[in-house]
Amino acid sequence: SDNSTSIICSIAEDKPANEKSAHSYNILMLHVANALADFIIGHYEEKLISRIINTNYCYFNSVERKEILSIAIRIIKNEDKNFLNSLFQIRRRNIIIRKLLEYFESSNSLILDGFVNFRLKDYIKDLEEIVEKAVDEFLMEREYREFIRLLKYFVEIQDPKVEVIHVVVGFESKYILLDENRKEITKDCIQEFIDEISEGEINYDDLLVSSLITMAPRKIVLHSSGLFRNKELLETIKNVFPGRV
């Protein structure tokens, strides 16, 4: 049909005449399979991912599905240079090559649309797992955005208790808070969380964010930001206090 992609491979003899020509034939088919694998990845992968999203996750709206698609493509292209993703990239390509070589053992022509849809079940299953991962990442990002929006609201509805808070990383990643006169105010800031602190293990990152929200300073100065072990914490503070950090 007009929507199908046909690629026909013709070999002069049905079977190689001798061992040398058999070796040449195998090399030829390997080159053909490699070229077709690259073509399938380049021309089908994004369409297949989009189809999986639209079929399996139709309850997301069109904007959300586009966002999930972009996350899935980022994962599949390994833009984050993740080692495991690199291995999965190689695995997916090898699945396609293996299936093509199996197919060419009994045929020298194929319609790519049919081949992709009916012969590459393992490959499509891998893509479905990537989409599932992209959906999880999307939901986590959405949850994070909603969380940040809520924290920003808490900051906006209260009057600043201090003009400036200086944040310094202390011993064992504890945070020291200073006011505009460089006087330590750490104890004052954490006073209302003292019961929670005495009850169990302390998460100093959460304690810092909670303290800053409670004090709602007009300006936050982060000293030696390179010493902050949790880089996401820095982003959270910047997002909750836009224009103040």
PLM feature spans:
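C-terminal structured domains
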Residues: 180-245
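Conserved mixed alpha/beta catalytic, RNA-binding, or beta-rich assembly cores of soluble enzyme
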Residues: 1-206
